Amino acid sequence: RRLPQAFSAMQDQLQWLSSGVSDYEIAVPIHEIESCAAGTAYYKGVDEGVRYEQLDFIADQCDQMFPRLRIFLFDAHRVFSSPVTIFGPNLAVVYVGQCYLAFREVERVKSLSSHFDWLVREAVVDARNVSTHIRSLIER
């Protein structure tokens, strides 16, 4: 997406989350947050101020939106997942690079939901501690 479209989509998502109509539970590999803070891997060359501002924004959202927004950080050296989104009991989507695979069959959705639950159980940083962890990375 272009920047204006991405910003608009993010604003819409924040407004939806703030409305209290839905909860968001997100599992992210911890190395993504650490790489962003350190300016390595995908984030190499991105200005430190920009990276820190983004991480601070994420930490603020975690504080303000908890428990409607729960982010868990897992160790991708121990557990692996392609990006997956569960939209309730009837739809799950897996991102495979250039496209998404959508599943509507109940047993497949249950299987992907169980996989996501496993990521949450294996998290090395619980949702209650994510904002503190993020801030510790940008205060080094």
What are these regions, as identified by a protein language model?
Residues R1-E139:
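Hydrophobic protein-protein interaction segments
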